[in-house]
Swiss-Prot record:
Entry superkingdom: Bacteria
Role, per record: Probably part of the binding-protein-dependent transport system YdhWXYZ for an amino acid; probably responsible for the translocation of the substrate across the membrane.
Domain (ABC transmembrane type-1): residue spans on this chain: 88-381
Species: Escherichia coli (strain K12)
Listed name of the protein: Putative amino-acid ABC transporter permease protein YhdX
Main subcellular location of this protein, as a coarse class: membrane
Origin organism lineage: Bacteria, Pseudomonadati, Pseudomonadota, Gammaproteobacteria, Enterobacterales
């Protein structure tokens, strides 16, 4: 009986590792809760002392300032909530453009690093070593102040067949206007794609069963080109083009690619493509050389070997670090505030914060946007990575 009591007493003593672990965890939780409570109380007290009301009611108030680029309709008197949407769309736009351009450029630069051509290999190496070792902010300044801002003014703009004009105020290009046959055109395009994909799959199945290869692309080309043209002939033009024209000291009509967007896209695309190129090179070199020899022994030409044998296997190595580069693009897009591009940081965490004083709300919303975008990219890339992963039986 006494032995049982001493055992229970010993198990509840501080010398017991389990007791110490639980005690330390409880103390840590109490400390964290206390710090959070102190921060909350301190924040509320400071806001009350300064007469700042918390909450998101400010989103319904009028902004009172213009925005040079907006993908949706925006007027100077629109609300701060609409400013938030404009900044979000501008951030998504520059992130998407940079991801596409950096991926394409990095892919070809990475292939050039493995080329048998000495000059091409050295030029790609120089490209990578230069652009990945210069801070992205300096590259943004270079493209914006040293290149784009030194272009001629609107009256001396560089013209391309009087359809597009390049000046220090941006690139003006014709903008599409929806016509009467737009819906019919879209339906025709979708139908052509569906029929072409079905035809490719049917011919692939036929080739597997019989060993005979049927040429699919001529019929697919006729479908993709012919059906939309037929829809336009029957229902009218799908699009009309608004061509920019010089009016006074600037161009009117069309759409404009502002210098800030161009500089940001160029800088981040070039900067990130240098890292992606090294990822592509490492991924290709990670594929066993026996795969190259096996494809060569089957008589496959180098482009086919690369496209159908090497790249599919290299993707398993490429995708994880490539995801990190895509996330870096989204986060580096916040540098747009340095040259005045109206993204989330410049518009919402900058102008809106200064006008409303709602620092906690604006910063929290801005941080949440970047967090959600990053998590979405990670989720999509992880799903794709699992689809291409080798499944062991």
């Amino acid at each position: 009986m006494s032995h049982r009591r001493s055992t229970v007493k010993g198990s509840l003593s501080f010398a017991n590792p389990t007791v110490r672990a639980w005690l330390f965890q409880i103390l840590a939780v109490v400390a964290v809760v206390g710090i959070v409570g102190w921060l909350f109380h301190n924040t509320v007290t400071n806001l009350n002392n300064r007469g700042i009301t918390s909450g998101f009611a400010f989103l319904d108030r009028g902004a009172g300032f213009g925005i040079v680029q907006h993908l949706i309709d925006y007027q100077q008197g629109d609300t701060y909530g609409r400013v938030f949407i404009v900044g979000l769309l501008n951030t998504l736009l520059v992130s998407a453009l940079c991801i596409v351009f950096a991926s394409v450029l990095g892919f070809f630069i990475g292939l050039a690093r493995l080329s048998d051509n000495w000059l091409l290999r050295k030029l790609s190496t120089i490209y990578i070593e230069i652009f990945r070792n210069i801070p992205p902010l300096l590259q943004i300044f270079f493209w914006y102040f040293a290149v784009l801002r030194n272009l001629p003014g609107p009256r001396q703009a560089v013209s391309a067949f009087d359809l597009a004009f390049l000046s220090n105020r941006g690139l003006y290009i014709p903008s599409p206007q929806l016509g009467d046959g737009f819906i019919a055109f879209i339906l025709a395009v979708v139908m052509a794609i569906v029929l072409s994909v079905g035809l490719f799959r049917f011919n692939k199945t036929y080739q597997i069963k019989t060993g005979q290869l049927r040429r699919t692309w001529p019929i697919a080309a006729v479908l993709i080109i012919g059906l939309p043209l037929l829809a336009q002939w029957l229902f009218g033009a799908a699009l009309h083009w608004d061509v920019p024209a010089l009016r006074g000291f600037n161009f009117r009509g069309g759409m404009v690619l502002i210098p800030e967007l161009a500089a940001l896209t160029l800088a981040l695309s070039v900067y990130t493509s240098a890292f992606i190129a090294e990822i592509i090179r490492a991924g290709i070199q990670a594929v066993p050389y026996g795969q190259h020899e096996a494809a060569r022994s089957l008589g496959l030409p180098n482009p086919v070997t690369l496209r159908q044998v090497i790249i599919p296997q290299a993707l398993r190595v490429i995708i994880p670090p490539l995801t990190s580069q895509y996330l870096n693009i989204v986060k580096n897009s916040s540098l747009a505030a340095a040259i005045g591009y109206p993204d989330m940081v410049s518009l919402f965490a900058g102008t809106v914060l200064n006008q409303t004083g709602q620092a906690i709300e604006t910063i929290a919303m801005t941080m949440s946007v970047y967090l959600i975008i990053s998590l979405t990219i990670s989720l999509l890339m992880n799903i794709y990575n699992r689809r291409i992963a080798i499944v062991e039986r």
